[in-house]
């Protein structure tokens, strides 16, 4: 730690996005992250935009009120679409290494990333919990009102929207420098108590509690398959519930678990609380991959809707069939005119 102090002056003269520990361990620039981010976001943007736009259109227009998870699916799609719409600006920056817009727009895009992540976590958890609860308590499902889901969704947006504000606030240093954004934003130094409190809240509310809930739902749904079916509830209904809960769990663990495991170490490295060079290197090199995996939820969630709601599949099939028929008819009419 004594040697680490020698680099303090260098750190003060250097980039705000670089911590003292990074300079000490000679990991001042993870160069591959720019091409990784740009490539990932390019691959996600078009499919994510088309899939989530189509999903939102089908969910809002065609899915019946009988589908209890519809409200949570719509909100999940909105969260994904908000992040996807910000990807062109991220792609431009990571390719050009220059931010020509206002700093406020940069921080808004940065904020939308974390809003998407934690809103997605909450809505995936709600879908799993609701599906499991209605499977175990089918009579309660009959009395459940859609306005309850609307109220829960509104509360989630308010709480998550407020809770995500520290992310752009902590990165809003050096406001006069409008040329850098996203991965190159600086970090505000925090005292250890405030930092530990922020990490604890983020990990507990944004990861640990949802993991416990989703794991419990998966366990209870699996057990229900071994029990005799209740009135008006066949084995197929339980299998559909299990498939839904399993898919929510899969999206959650693939997209969000790596980030939250690395988040603790990465934040402590940036705040110069951890100075062990092996830990510094692992946290910094792993971080870009974690963020890319988190953005992958924008592609996986529409697949979730497809397998969760039979009406969703039916509407896509009907729309695809109608498009095919219209094309065939136009070709036939064109051929008859030529003939």
UniProtKB/Swiss-Prot annotation:
This protein's GO CC annotations: plasma membrane
The answer to keyword Transmembrane helix applying to this record is yes
- Paired cysteines (S-S): 106-181
Glycosylation-annotated residues = 16, 26, 178
Q: How does it sit in the membrane?
A: Multi-pass membrane protein
PROSITE patterns in the record = G_PROTEIN_RECEP_F1_2
Alphabetical UniProt keywords = Cell membrane, Disulfide bond, G-protein coupled receptor, Glycoprotein, Membrane, Receptor, Transducer, Transmembrane, Transmembrane helix
Q: Which residues lie on this side of the membrane: Extracellular?
A: 1-39, 90-103, 171-193, 266-288
Give the InterPro entries listed for this entry.
Answer: GPCR_Rhodpsn, GPCR_Rhodpsn_7TM
Q: In which tissues is it expressed?
A: Weakly expressed in blood leukocytes.
- Cited Pfam families: 7tm_1
The record's section on Gene3D superfamilies has:
Rhodopsin 7-helix transmembrane proteins (1.20.1070.10)
Q: Can you name one GO molecular function term for this protein?
A: G protein-coupled receptor activity
Report which superkingdom the organism of origin falls in: Eukaryota
Q: Which SUPFAM superfamilies match?
A: Family A G protein-coupled receptor-like
Q: Which family does it belong to?
A: Belongs to the G-protein coupled receptor 1 family.
What function does this protein fulfil?
Putative receptor for purines coupled to G-proteins.
Designated name of the protein: Putative P2Y purinoceptor 10
Gene responsible for this protein: P2RY10
């Amino acid at each position: 730690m004594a040697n680490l102090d020698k680099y303090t002056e260098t750190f003060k003269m250097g980039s705000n996005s670089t911590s003292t520990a990074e300079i000490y361990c000679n990991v001042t620039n993870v160069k591959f992250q720019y091409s990784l981010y740009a490539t990932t976001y390019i691959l996600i943007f078009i499919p994510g935009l088309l899939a989530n736009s189509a999903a939102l259109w089908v969910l809002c227009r065609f899915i019946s009120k009988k589908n209890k998870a519809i409200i949570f699916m719509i909100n999940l799609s909105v969260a994904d679409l908000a992040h996807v719409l910000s990807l062109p600006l991220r792609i431009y920056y990571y390719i050009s290494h220059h931010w020509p817009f206002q700093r406020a727009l940069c921080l808004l895009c940065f904020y939308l990333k974390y809003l998407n992540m934690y809103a997605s976590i909450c809505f995936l958890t709600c879908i799993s919990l609701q599906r499991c609860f209605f499977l175990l308590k089918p009579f309660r499902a009959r009395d459940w009102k859609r306005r309850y889901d609307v109220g829960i969704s509104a509360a989630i947006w308010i709480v998550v929207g407020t809770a995500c504000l520290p992310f752009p606030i902590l990165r809003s240093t050096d406001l006069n420098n409008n040329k850098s954004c996203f991965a190159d934003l600086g970090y505000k130094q925090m005292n250890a108590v405030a930092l530990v409190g922020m990490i604890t809240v983020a990990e507990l509310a944004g990861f640990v509690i949802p993991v416990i809930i989703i794991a419990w739902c998966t366990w209870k749904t699996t057990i229900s398959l071994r029990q005799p079916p209740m009135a008006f509830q066949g084995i197929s209904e339980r299998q559909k519930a299990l498939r839904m809960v399993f898919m929510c769990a899969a999206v959650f663990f693939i997209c969000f678990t790596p980030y939250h495991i690395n988040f603790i170490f990465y934040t402590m490295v940036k705040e110069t609380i951890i100075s062990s060079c092996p830990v510094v290197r692992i946290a910094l090199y792993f971080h870009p991959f974690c963020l890319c995996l988190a953005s992958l939820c924008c592609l996986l969630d529409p697949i979730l809707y497809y397998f969760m709601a039979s009406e969703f599949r039916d509407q896509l099939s009907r729309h695809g069939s109608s498009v095919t028929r219209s094309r065939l008819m136009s070709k036939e009419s064109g051929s008859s005119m030529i003939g």
